[in-house]
Every structure is written in structure tokens, then in C-alpha cells.
Amino acid sequence: MIHKNAVGKIDPHRLTPVRGPSTELDPHIDSCEFDELPGYAAKVRSLKKDPNFAVDLFSGAGGLSLGLHRANFDVILACDIRNDSIMTHRHHFGGCSYECDLSKRKVVNEIADKLNECGEISLIAGGPPCQPFSRNI
């Protein structure tokens, strides 16, 4: 359904979302799995002098990762709880796009251990929540 404003023009901010079958996105050519992360970090180090590794927590589909990339960071790990967000992130970015629940201490410890195997991390960023998708913990 298309909504019109008071003067009869289409209001683009009131379009009704259409949900259809999901689309499978191919992973980025430089994407890796969580257990492959230290090897991916070593590969980036071999190709770039002094890379600035970053981690994007609560990444969503990758808006903050894009900004970090444009600021010359290499986002080696992005984490989000939503599968569709992670699939979109994995399609657009190299590194590891990891679907996980960061409210679980065990998960956070596993991530910390894996990052310790990667060497120096320059930045850990946490994206602001998208309120309609956030849940109360």
C-alpha cells in the first residue's frame, strides 16, 4: 500500500514493507569463519604494513564497519545476533561476520580468546542499537 500525504503526494516515509522469500547472498571473497580468524589476521598482516585491526560489536548489516573501512581500519570481526544482518555483512565485507549472542559470558570469552590469537587490535567499536530490533535483557 502506498500512502499519500495531505496534498496527495506519495509519502516515501510511509511505504508498507513487503516481506518476501529471502535472498541468499554469496560471501565476500575474503570472508572467513570464526575458527579461521587468526589465519585471516596473519594474511592481512602479510599483505599490509601495520594494519589497524578493528572489531565491530552489534554490527548489524555493517554501517559502522563501512565507516571504519573508510577510516582505514581493517574490520577483522563483526558480531551480531541476527542471522540476516550477519549474512548481509558477510556479503559486503571480508573478515569474520559472526552470528552470536554477546549477552552470554561464554561467547564473549570465546571471542576474547580468539582475538588474543590475532595480535594487536587497534579498535573495538560497539554499534548503537536499532530500537525496533533490540531486546531487553
Show the residue positions of the predicted features.
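Conserved active-site and SAM-binding loop architecture
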Residues: 1-137
